Amino acid sequence: LDETYVDGIILTASNTRKEQLRYNAYRDLFEFKVDGQARVLDPSTTIKKVNLGEETFVVEKYVTDKGIAKYGYFTLLDSGKANLFSKKSVKFTPGMKGRALDGGDQPAEYRRAPDEFYFKVNGSDLVEIRSVKSMIAAFPDKQEELSAFARKEKISPRNILK
């Protein structure tokens, strides 16, 4: 996300370290330098959280679009009985040779993709927020109450994430 390294704190199960860090959203890892050498911090269960400026990143298990379960870094937006997370991502677009009418080549580029939002209730699995209905379905004992509230307040997914 950022080319420059920023002061950050890595909290693991056994210790706390201050490092110059930056988050690589394309590869979903943190990069830091030790004696001028670049190192990486892959998401693993030993990492409790990483504070980078105003943001707190935590490691959570999730299922990718391809159905593969893996660990990744998520920005913690809100915590309590239910936790709200965002997943930052960057997409790579390969370069293309210009065609007759295009007028030139298209260079390869990395482009920031919209954040994906997730929630987790009482230690359950991470659930992606795709729509208000899917979020309400995750609370079977409060479904009617939440549906009525969403209708009354005219809640859209954008409102949930603000």
What are these regions (language model features)?
Residues 139-162:
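Long, compositionally biased interface segments
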Residues 126-146:
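Strongly charged, low-complexity linkers/loops
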Residues 1-7:
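Extracellular/luminal recognition modules and glycoprotein regions
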